[in-house]
Curated annotation (Swiss-Prot):
InterPro entries: Acyl_CoA_acyltransferase, GNAT_dom, NAT10/TcmA_helicase, P-loop_NTPase, TmcA/NAT10/Kre33, TmcA_C_sf, TmcA_N, TmcA_tRNA_bind. The gene is tmcA. Keywords: Acyltransferase, ATP-binding, Cytoplasm, Nucleotide-binding, RNA-binding, Transferase, tRNA processing, tRNA-binding. This is tRNA(Met) cytidine acetyltransferase TmcA. Belongs to the RNA cytidine acetyltransferase family. TmcA subfamily. GO terms for biological process: rRNA acetylation involved in maturation of SSU-rRNA; tRNA acetylation; tRNA wobble cytosine modification. Catalyzes the formation of N(4)-acetylcytidine (ac(4)C) at the wobble position of tRNA(Met), by using acetyl-CoA as an acetyl donor and ATP (or GTP). It comes from Citrobacter koseri (strain ATCC BAA-895 / CDC 4225-83 / SGSC4696). Its EC number is 2.3.1.193. Residues 349-531 form the N-acetyltransferase domain. The lineage of its organism: Bacteria, Pseudomonadati, Pseudomonadota, Gammaproteobacteria, Enterobacterales.
Amino acid sequence: MSDNDALRALTAQMAQEGIRRLLVLSGDVSWCRERALALREALAGDWLWVATDAPAAPHCTPQALQTLLGREFRHAVFDAQLGFDASAFAALSGTLRAGSWLVLLTPPYSAWESRPDADSLRWSDCPQPVATPHFIQHLKRVMARDEQTLHWQQSQPFSWPRFPARPHWQPATGEPQPEQAAILRHLLRMPPGVAAVTAARGRGKSALAGQLISRMSGTAIVTAPSKAATDVLAQFAGEKFRFLAPDALLAGTETADWLIVDEAAAIPAPLLHRLASRFSRILLTTTVQGYEGTGRGFLLKFCARFPHLRRFELRQPVRWAQGCPLEQWVGEALIFDDETFAHAPQGAIRFSAFTQALWHTGPAQPLAVYQLLSGAHYRTSPLDLRRMMDAPGQHFLGAFTAERVAGAAWLVEEGRLSAALSQAVWAGYRRPRGNLVAQSLAAHGGDPLAATLTGRRVSRIAVHPARQREGIGQQLIAEAYGGASRCDYLSVSFGYTAELWRFWQRCGFVLVRMGNHKEASSGCYTAMALLPISEAGARLAHREHQRLRRDAEILARWNGEAIPVIPLKASTLNDDDWDELAGFAFAHRPLLTSLGSLSRLLERCELALPALRGRLEEKCSDANLCIRLGLPGRKALLVAQRREVAHALTALDDERAQRLRERVLQWQFFH
């Protein structure tokens, strides 16, 4: 039997068995492409080629793959020669029909882990690509123990193997599968209340929701993060499908017998709670074990508020057979099996720091930490796995029992920018990669040199639900504080809730910033807080906290929510206000960043300043203000507002205004 005949026979067997497989081609670029093109000639199929520079159609870049979700393909090539976009790779695997090959192109096997990975530019906060040895070593370990994955290396012999036969697979007919049918029976008889259906990709979760709508006697409204993602649901719901976006649903008065929320974990929890209060029966569906994030954290946080919640899980794949080798390999390689929280960590707690090197010497421990963090945070994705394994400046702490992980914290080094760059960030001239809190302290705070200090930001922290309220989270922060003696502060950025803020207060943090718009991911205002370590860190925390207190009443009026600090009455302009106003008038600081000082300027100044007063005092929208003032758009409006502030400063103290103007203009010449 020729090689092509053996390939076709194996592919036919895979189709009968309802499975997909991974074939890894390792070698130089031209060899890998030649082999992949030869496979494309030998096997009929779609052969979607995912690469930045593909030699054949159909093709798309890894970044464009999200636009193809919901479609299906037979066979695909994923080019990882220059970089491995893990989310795109996982998404591609989910589009492949039963009987498909996913062909992965990699650099020569021995050189792979030392090669700079272009994808690292998205998550490493480095200006140049970095090598990713821990991730590549992890992939190699997964490949080595997986007998179902095929590996063809340049200059090495290869033949198509024969695999033992599996049971023949019966593809879905469109009727509910046994697992779906059982859940449908429960839902159709369900009294008023909330139900949640969780599933990994390809389990028919959206189909189940559509089947519920088509079979119910009453009416239903469907909502989801995007309508485009509800195509499958709409197909099964038929004529009874009715979609409203979450914000439109909340703004209106529409009602129905059921509210169906598809991918509920991707909708901000406060918004979801408000929606849930309007309907008597609610079905929430969300993905667990996925490249878009995991839903177990959603179940823990959101569903805990509904004590009589009915929970269902779909386990049986619909689009391929149980035990599909490709699904198993992707799940193991990208660690989609997050912590289920089914088993409580028992016994005494031992706190221990570890580094990324542990992925090489003892991978079980960092793997368990990642699974805990993934299970507790909805938005954990393969990008976070890549960062945890190989990004510079990462620090990890675990709270371990004898056999399990009870808690973990992940911190990221920030700051240490040059004085010139920090000043340029403050003035709005630069936003270099990374440094979330350190940059925000400069860009939105009052100290142009704030980003020169060294901080460690708490990126993630989680405690197993069975061990919460024992002080483990606080102890993790205390351990992090003790291990950061050479830093100026610890920092955290989070979606503000009173409950979360109480935790950070107990840890000793000082609130230094509240955002002025709600984050889409949490439905909350962003809060930032510091735990000072050095004297310089203490001075910065005090200065920014006092600034927040001066702005508190103004921010509260703007946000419509109280700021959790003791307000300071301040109607006069101090030195910090003058600096900030100069940064707005003569440089590029944003309008809302300067809300407090601008509001105090309007109180002090008797000039008309229509562009500024219209926005800040009347809360007129940019569009309406442009019409009123005869301006062509938002850019022209911002120019007018900056000009008005410059005019007001000059009127108050011309000499001081010019001196500050000359200073902030110098800051654009950073190095």
